[in-house]
Amino acid sequence: MLSLEEGYGIQLAPNSISILNKIGFRNIDKNHFFNPLKLNFYSNNNKICDLDLGKFNNDSIKYTTLQRSTLIEFLKDKLFTNNFRFGKEVRKVSKIQDKLLINFSDNTNDLVDFIIVSDGVFSKTKSIIESKDIKPRYNGSVAIRSVIKFSEEFNYESKNISLIMLPNAHIVIYPINKKGYFNLVCIVREKLSQNYDINSIIKKKILSKNKNLENLFKADLNLWPVYVSKKPIKSIHDNVFYLGDAFYTFVPALAQGASQSIEAAYELFNLLYENKKNIQNLYFTKRLKRIKQINKRSKFNYFGFHISNPLLMNLRNFILKRFVINKNFIQSYLGKIYK
């Protein structure tokens, strides 16, 4: 069995792979990642159509799926682990002329030129720096995750991504390595609760719609409420930058969370390296434009994946069949994001 401590899967589109390749990503062990060929769309148990992911690839930059731990270990090796100090908690940040003084909870201090905050959707550091309580918004859904092993009971194409659309839910399955392991994430509309019953949710919201999906949920399962950002925030300090989910967390329907973190980090690196003036405004303006572009598509996908009205489901399926083969639409809708 695969230990869940090794991490669930992530999808990296070509827009982030092109950046990672600059620090040697193409040289990692080929058994530790996968390059899916297609995205298969299913309405309940019936395959509707597929999207050729090769449209966004070239010989060295390909749509990639892998475990989070594989990416984290690669980045730690490439970004000088010995220069990082882990387990630090920011207690206070003060401006001293053009620098920032960080007071940590262990009573140590650091005087720095810049602070880059990337501590997730529930960023405590952001609230401390901005001197106000900044909270995300519950999205009205939960994410159920698992890592599953290929077996004869696996009814989906092992070399591709499968997107199964159900009333008020969707499931995504994809290979995370070449050892026969797959990431499963199920997004289900559900009221916020202090005590979720995973098996009850699966039975009522998934298996009641499609009993054939039962085999997907036999491994260890974990559940998280899905939170999204209310709006991006520009810091009160010119030399503080927010990155990843600390900057903005999307609705989980476009698989761009990790890719946008990488993309934003590269943008910020270039601005700092080139010693640009007014860096914060340049960074925030470009990120805000990108966020709006992706957020609009994510929300639209989320709505489309969860349609429950039978007539609208048929219409969605009809449109999907035509859109996936329309080169102009694919380039406009996904090409601008993935390339």
Predicted regions and their residues:
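Structural motif
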Residues: 35, 87, 96, 167, ...
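Histidine-centered metal-chelating micro-motifs
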Residues: 122-123, 143-145, 169-172, 247-248
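Conserved catalytic motifs of the protein kinase core domain
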Residues: 111, 181, 238-239
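Conserved mid-domain beta->alpha element of the FAD-binding
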Residues: 116-117, 220-305
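C-terminal auxiliary extensions adjacent to catalytic cores
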Residues: 317-339
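Glycine-rich FAD pyrophosphate-binding loop
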Residues: 1-8
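Conserved N-terminal helical subregion
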Residues: 13-129, 134-147, 189-199
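Conserved FAD/dinucleotide-binding core of flavoprotein oxidoreductases
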Residues: 49-72, 152-223
